[in-house]
C-alpha cells in the first residue's frame, strides 16, 4: 500500500494540472552597458516592469554560436565544445548534432512532458548551410522556422520543418516581422490542454543593421554612447588584442560608429513591435497569465570602447553583460543582483515545466540565488578547433605569454584601471585556482559558492 501511495504522489508532481507555457525571446548582440534596452519601450512596459530583472546576467561565451549552444544545453563551452562561429570550431558540426543537440531543453520538454515546441529565427550561425549538411529539423522541435546561416534581415532563407523557403527584399519580407507572424499564427491555435515552448530569435541588433523600412531614421542624430572607455585606453593595460589598433581611432571612424549605433537601435524597434504582438496574442487567447516570457540576448557588444571599433568576443562588461528579464506566474516585480549565467537558462526552463536534469547551471526560479557565486566566461577564439598543437606551450610553460586583468566595479565601473598585477599574490592565487577548477567543472560543480568550494 505504501508503494502505491508514493507512486501516486510522484505522478502528481511530474504532471502538473495546468502546465505553464514558455516563450523565450533571444535577441542577437544586444548590449546592456550601452543602453541597448532604451529603444525597447514596449518590452520594458510589458516584461521588464512586470517581472524580475537579473541585473548581473553574463554570457557564458561572448559570441553567438557558442553561447546559443550554452543556452540550449545548459553547458559551459568546455562541455559542449562549440568553440566559435565556424563549422571547424563546432558550430552545427556533426559532433554537435551527435552529442549536445540531443540534450537541449526542447527535447526534454517535448519528449518527457508533452510540450508542443516552436522555434523561429536564428539558431546556430552555420545552421542549414551546405557545408554543415544542409536543411534539417533539429530534434525536439515540432514547428521549425530556422534561419539558414547567420543573421540577415532581407534576402534570406528559412528552413520550414526542413524545407527551404526564400524571402526577398520587400517590406513584408523583413525577418523580425516574419518571425512575429509565424508566432502569432501559432498562438492563435493553442489551447490550455497542451503546454507549449516557443523560442523567437530575431536577427536584431546584429549586423548588417538593417531596420524595417518603417523605422528608418527613427534615431537620426543619435550618437554612440561616449562612455569613459570610449576611444580611450590611457593606461594601455589590457591584453594584447585590445592594444593592437590605433588609439585614439582616426576621426573618420567615429561617424561610422555613430551610424551603426543608431541603426542597431532602429533594428530593435521591430523586436519591440514583435514583443507587443506576442503579448497581445497571449492575452487574447486568455493564456498570458499561464505563460512565462523570458527576454535575453546571446551576448553584448562594444562600440568604440578602449578604441576597439565594433564587435563582441572581449572579456569586458560591454560584451559579456547581457539583459535578462522574466515575467510569469508567481514572478514578482523585482531586481535580483545575484550573478547568473546563460547556462542557467536550461535549468530554468526545465524547472518551469516541472523537470530536473544535469546541467552546469541552476534554475533562476530558486529563492536562494547566492550573491557570492563565481561565474565562468570562456572563449577560445576564431579558427580554434580545440586541439593544441604539439609545439604549442601550455600554461605551465614559462615562455607562455599570459595576461591578468582584474577590476573593482565599485570604484571603476568602466574597467579603466587594471588591478591584476597590483593584487596581492595570495588573492591572485585564489582567483587563479577558482579559474582552473571552473574550466574543468561539470554539473553542480559549476555552481560553486564562495572560495571554499574551489
Question: Across the structure, where does each feature detected by a protein language model lie?
Answer:
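Active-site-proximal cap/lid insertion segments
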Residues: 29-38, 148-174, 184-194, 198-342, ...
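Loop/turn elements at helix/coil->beta-strand transitions in domains of secreted/extracellular proteins
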Residues: 19-23, 49-55, 66, 79, ...
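Classical eukaryotic N-terminal signal peptides for Sec-dependent ER targeting/secretion
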Residues: 1-9
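Short, solvent-exposed turn/loop segments enriched in Gly/Ser/Thr/Pro and often Arg
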Residues: 37-40, 52-76, 83, 119-132, ...
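C-terminal cap/loop subdomain of S1 sulfatases and analogous C-terminal strand-loop tails that border
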Residues: 140-143, 148, 299-305, 341-346, ...
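Cleavable N-terminal signal peptides
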Residues: 6-7, 17, 57
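Active-site segment of extracytoplasmic enzymes that catalyze sulfate/phosphate-ester chemistry
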Residues: 24-27, 31-118, 129, 149-150, ...
